[in-house]
Structure formats: C-alpha cells, structure tokens
Amino acid sequence: MGVIPCAIIGLLLDNIIEDYLSKNIVIAITLILYGMIFIFVEKHPKKEKIQTIERLDYKSALKIGCFQCLALIPGTSRSGATILGGLYCGCSRTVASEFSFFLAIPVMFGATLLKVIKYLMKVGLFSFGQLFLLVLGTFVAFVVSLFAIKALLNYVKNHDFTVFGWYRIILGIFVILFFYIL
C-alpha cells in the first residue's frame, strides 16, 4: 500500500520534476526545510500508538506512502519523508525507520528500472563494461545499504532525529554558499 502513491505520481510527473525542480536552490531549500521539520517533530512528539511493524495498518501505510511522494522533490530524503510520515501516523522511531526501509525496496527498484529504460531508449544497449559496472555498483550499494540500515536502526533505538535535522540544515546552507555565494 505504501508504494502505490509514489509509483503513480512518480510515473506521471517524472519529466516535470526533472525539468523544473532539479535545481540547486530547490535542493538547498528542501534540505533546510526538512531539517527544520525533523527538529520540530522531535521537540513536539506525537503519542506513539504503533510500537511494532506488525501493528501498522493499511490506512497508515497508505498515508506514509503519500509522504514518500514528497521525496520526488529533489533534496528531499525518501527515508526522511517516510520516517516523518511514520512519526505523524503515530509510529515509534524504530517502526517508522523499519517501514521506511521496507518501502525503499520496490521504489528504488522501480526508479532504477525507469532510468535504465529511458537510457536504453535514448542511447541503446549497454556495452559489456557498462553492464558489468551497473551490476557491480548495484551489488556494492546493496551490501553497503544493509550495513547502513542496521547502524541507523540501532541508532534510533536510543537517539532521536535532531542530529539529522541539523545535518540537513548545515548541508543546505553549504549548498547555497557553494553554488550561489562563493
């Protein structure tokens, strides 16, 4: 259920998003905005009603999927948007994070498949070397992501997301400085 909204919106608006929103200023603003939202959410927490992923119902999953659509805007973290959606729906940090990573699998696969199809239609078939690098890169990214997910899930059991909020704000300011001031 959580994947459906993003799949529909992503397919319908892919070119528009790529043409109009893939700007450094949009990325900087969304980095800062979501950083502020993370800090706000941590300072004003909702009551945690959902303590285990098994208690997550279809309605909440669909709502979290709608939050995932926000990640179509460049600079928005897909996992950040879905974690915020989970917290909004009353999930614990751990459940929100776990569900966010479950949602990533079909969305990342679908987005990658769409980009590969666009590439094939525009350029043609991959060379053997390109195909090898694509498969190797995918495998390495998958293995590294498993370690990163495990580390993040361990982190959120004992910490909040405030540090991620500040990280996003600082990175957004750096993007503005780098591309518009320096």
What are these regions (language model features)?
Residues M1-L182:
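Multi-pass membrane proteins that catalyze or facilitate reactions on polyprenyl-/lipid-phosphate substrates
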